[in-house]
From Swiss-Prot:
Principal location: mitochondrion
Subcellular location, record wording: Mitochondrion inner membrane
TM ranges: 22-42, 60-80, 92-112, 113-133, 147-167, 193-213, 224-244, 257-277, 284-303, 308-330, 342-362, 393-413, 435-455
Record's keyword terms, sorted: Electron transport, Membrane, Mitochondrion, Mitochondrion inner membrane, NAD, Respiratory chain, Translocase, Transmembrane, Transmembrane helix, Transport, Ubiquinone
Top-level EC class: translocase
Reaction catalyzed: a ubiquinone + NADH + 5 H(+)(in) = a ubiquinol + NAD(+) + 4 H(+)(out)
UniProt keyword Kinase present: no
Name of the molecule in the record: NADH-ubiquinone oxidoreductase chain 4
GO CC annotation: mitochondrial inner membrane
Highest taxon listed in the record's lineage: Eukaryota
InterPro entries for the chain: NADH4_N (IPR000260), NADH_Q_OxRdtase_chainM/4 (IPR010227), NADH_UbQ_OxRdtase (IPR003918), ND/Mrp_TM (IPR001750)
Amino acid sequence: MLKFIIPTIMLMPLTWLSKNNLIWINSTAHSLLISFSSLLLLNQLNDNSLNYSLMFFSDPLSTPLLILTMWLLPLMLMASQSHLIKEPPVRKKLYITMLITLQALLIMTFTATELILFYIMFEATLIPTLIIITRWGNQTERLNAGLYFLFYTLVGSLPLLVALVYLQNTTGSLNFLLLQHWAQPLSTSWSNIFMWLACMMAFLVKMPLYGLYLWLPKAHVEAPIAGSMVLAAVLLKLGGYGMLRITSMLNPLTEHMAYPFLMLSLWGMIMTSSICLRQTDLKSLIAYSSVSHMALVIAAILIQTPWSYMGATALMIAHGLTSSMLFCLANSNYERIHSRTMILPGGLQVFLPLMASWWLLASLTNLALPPTINLIGELLVVMSVFSWSNPTILLMGTNIVITALYSLYMLIMTQRGKHTHHINNITPSFTREHALMALHIIPLLLLSLNPKIILGPLY
């Protein structure tokens, strides 16, 4: 595992020692090398996990998320270049250092064997993200967003620490690999119920569950582009990853406890999709669509069948790439028009035809068009939820229709219609932006050809 962690950390001296005109070239090129080398992890055998040491391991659940994390760093660097163009070199280097720190922490989060190490890294990812949001965000509202983000996640995850200390005292170890074999079946006593809640709350806030999601649209809207990308693509997946890891230790209590949360997420899925139809703010719409997609993942994980686990992992990876791409597209609009309102850039298709085709591709993957990986994930989740309880097909069907509606609404509002005069002298799109979109969509299309590599450990 060190072959990814050490090069990532060594990107920092590289950035600080680069000449001012080579900062972006060096950091992007070398982070791309790291992300290409991480693809070798897909080569491992499906039936077992790789134990690198006592600290780190990877199995078919964490490997796709690891690769997604490493794949995103060069993309974030590519996306951030134009909005940092007026900053002094020291600030650019600081910004890149924050992103690199975040990637190193995320790699350690996804490969930790020890629950306490996982918890520390899980919490540590807050710090760089918070700095990125509150320092480089666009409006002054960003401080409020940072506060929401910090307090929601901290209050949610403090009980988890208490639960972990309790687990350590009762079982003597917090190793993932051992606990799965040692865990005593939990009875339905009040103390166990509270422990279950303590374990799950941190991840449900991070996902986020309907009702605990208020920090997400705020953080997304105020964050700079790299903040939005990493938040949508990887930080939300931390919640799903943690839930997948920890539910195996909390059986058979989960079967008793899951009902209210299942209902909440199935209902919240429709509510947040409906909120999307009323949005005027482009970034806010994409943020709410993230909430509704993640609600599907929560439902899938709480049902705990092999099918739903496979659907959850596929949906997490697919959503990571898709929402990140949508944020990049929204950002390229924002840099030209300097507004996130969807009505203003109407008719952009005439001016930026290639960008319009990226918009079309991104919207179609977001609404889970066959044969994309999004559809595979959604189908697996819908089938497993349907076999758990038949009436849920009404909720699921409604959600799929609303998702299609708001995706097409977003596409039509930004690309079609009559263009207004204020976008007549718009700057053309850069090759850098097209490369960025291509690097998002190519993995999605390739995964559609071979989805089995991201279906998790139960495939």
